[in-house]
């Protein structure tokens, strides 16, 4: 397995893996709106500050990390918006290998840390905890569900 930096040019392969994982349990995200999916992938992979990695087993994309570089007063960070391993490859060490490779690569780039969000009720939560990630206790996720179009 090897780590490769991806770009917007890899959008079709990214979409296949991303939807193959996140439209199933436990996420069940509805990505049937192809325009919205394209825009989301472009948001994450098509910006000058985007940082996207793929984990390949031969020619097969089996892992994906989409995020961006954030310059912060404590140092430059890698913010991961989406991280996944192909469903049939989960539980076999690919995720641990992938995350370790990303950590080593960003360290070589001079980035100080990785920041990501996940839900507590999905298997990824325990995976991150076992991989030495800790909860930031003073942060809270807030969501405004008001209809801003009618304001």
Regions found by a protein language model. Name each.
Residues 1-16:
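A short beta-loop-alpha structural element at the N-terminal edge
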Residues 19-41:
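Conserved GNAT-fold acetyl-CoA-binding loop/helix
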Residues 42-54:
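A short helix-loop-beta-strand connector motif used in the catalytic cores of GNAT acetyltransferases and
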Residues 52-54, 60-69, 79, 84:
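Conserved beta-strand in the GNAT
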Residues 70-80, 90, 136-137:
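A conserved beta-turn-beta hairpin within the catalytic core of GNAT-like acetyltransferases
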Residues 85, 91-104, 130:
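Conserved acetyl-CoA-binding loop-helix of GNAT-fold acetyltransferases
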Residues 90, 115-125, 142-146:
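Conserved beta-strand-loop-alpha-helix junction that forms the acyl-donor binding cleft
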Residues 99, 106-119:
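Conserved GNAT acetyl-CoA-binding A-motif
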